[in-house]
Amino acid sequence: MAAPQRSRTTGAPSSGGPSENERGRGGDRRGGDRRGGDRRGGDDRNQFVERVVTINRVAKVVKGGRRFSFTALVVVGDGDGTVGVGYGKAKEVPTAIAKGVEEAKKNFFRVPRIQGTIPHSVRGEAAAGVVFLRPASPGTGVIAGGPVRAVLDCAGIHDVLSKSLGSSNAINIVHATVAALQGLEEPAAVAARRGLPLEDVVPGPILRAQARGRADAAAKASTGVA
């Protein structure tokens, strides 16, 4: 009686490497992942900080049923004083986010900063949402909720106090934060308009921290020259 044949799936692997088909499929798959990673990690994406604040699903009722689409509220900034907000809508979530990123880049604006914080207190409004921002001394951190924090992080503000009132809708809060940041003025311009010295406009702890930063930079420069 002949011995039963061993199944292909349960037989012991051969001593050689993987078959040509397996090597081809694995090679294509690994190569595709590497190429995809290079595209996602391009220079254009690395220079910006992106934060997806909220994603909503929208349903449209038509004769044949309901058609679903997605909206994405995205904040984009360089982490160094430039920030923008975009709103994208598409049938797929990644496409909606990509559209929001592109719109946010079109809405970039500069934010005045002093030693990682804002130069003065400010209030912003959008619809029923109200956001208050106040300067904070170095080391305080960003005291803010999710939507406000997303905008401040992308703008490169590291020390600030915030309070949001009224509407809790993320879209209103984000636009109120943007309105507050757009209402900021450079300390030198405020001092010149009021006829006051700069020390009377900027809080003392921030000025002292700024002076220490300049002294440290000068010390490092002198050490490097020597």
UniProtKB/Swiss-Prot annotation:
Specify whether RNA-binding is a keyword of the entry: yes
Q: Which GO biological process annotations does it have?
A: translation
Where is this chain compositionally biased, Basic and acidic residues type? Answer: 20-45
- One GO CC annotation, please? small ribosomal subunit
Provide the residue span(s) of the region labelled Disordered: 1-45
Q: Name one GO molecular function term.
A: structural constituent of ribosome
Q: Name one Pfam family in it.
A: Ribosomal_S5
Where in the sequence does UniProt note compositional bias of the Polar residues kind? 1-18
Superkingdom to which the source organism belongs: Bacteria
Q: Which UniProt keywords apply?
A: Ribonucleoprotein, Ribosomal protein, RNA-binding, rRNA-binding
* Keyword Signal attached: no
Domain spans labelled S5 DRBM: 48-111
Assembly and binders: Part of the 30S ribosomal subunit. Contacts proteins S4 and S8.
User: Which family does the UniProt entry place this protein in?
Assistant: Belongs to the universal ribosomal protein uS5 family.
Name the NCBIfam families on file.
rpsE_bact
Its function, per the record, reads: With S4 and S12 plays an important role in translational accuracy. Located at the back of the 30S subunit body where it stabilizes the conformation of the head with respect to the body.
Q: What is known of its domains?
A: The N-terminal domain interacts with the head of the 30S subunit; the C-terminal domain interacts with the body and contacts protein S4. The interaction surface between S4 and S5 is involved in control of translational fidelity.
Name the record gives this protein: Small ribosomal subunit protein uS5
